[in-house]
Amino acid sequence: RSTQSRSSAASDVYKRQSLFDPQEVESERTVIISEREGSENEPLFRLDEAMQMAAFEKHPYRYEVIGLKEDLLRIQRDDLYQHYRTYYAPNNAIVTVAGDFQTKEMLAQLREIYGDLKPSSLPEVHIESEPPLSKERHVEISGPGETTYLRVVYRAPAANHSDFFAFTVLDSILSGPASLNMFGGGGISNKTSRLYRALVETELAVSVYGGLQATVDPFLYPITITIHPRQTAEAALSVLDREIQRLQQEAVPEAEIQRAIKQARALFAYGSENITNQAFWLGYAEIFASYDWLIHYVQELEKVTPTDIQRIAQTYLQPPRRVVGIYRPTNMLGGN
């Protein structure tokens, strides 16, 4: 009964009967703008937004998910309603079901709930491909606070690219295992990673983490470093470059690769251990590749070799393919 109730609620959305009351639209606009303004007080949000703008010139990945403030102010109720009427349609949706159920009965239930919904006439969407970065770009932000941050982002492959799995293992070796999306796991330390040992244990940094994401189109591989109060971003960048050069020039020992695979595999297991996350990942994988991507994820990680890691480092982790960003704290109330 719970499944049917939730499915019925979801079908109400796709019946396209929501009214988008103008007063409710204005109320939500206020909430979202307030959320954005709160994020603008966070140094890493400001730095990340500026770096995405620098990394992409044409692709929508140029923009943060929450959008630009000027767009939030400009968008009208009719714009939202038309988007809803066009895209919230059964021919633009994927239903995923995870849990204890009988397949035949579940399919009948889904047909009963969704079967009468009318498809929408979907416009052809053309997303302009982003040209490769050919020169290192730099972003520097200053503002209130006491902490310096260094963030370096490299162009990374899409989730359905054959290099993605080797890149995932490289990330685990370099900065520690990281969640592929918001439905990630936890409890896996990155203290055995190369950058933790090179930066945190030497007190050049307070923390370091990476974060390869599973995306539809090629996105970014960010490495974020919180600089130690007595150190500089430039010193940390030099050490980062040294560790990347090691990956490019020296084969990673097999034992280190197996440990990294084990950590990445464990994090993925934590992130998909409950049925909500399983349903999310099945649907999400179907969007950017197919659900087989999820089914074979662990097996693909286990195929990665030292040669693969070296090739990924040589191909993707090059200075011309990156944006270097620094947030420098000041005593000012505002920033540049």
Name each region found by the language model.
Residues 1-10, 14:
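Single conserved hydrophobic/aromatic residue that forms the stacking wall/gate
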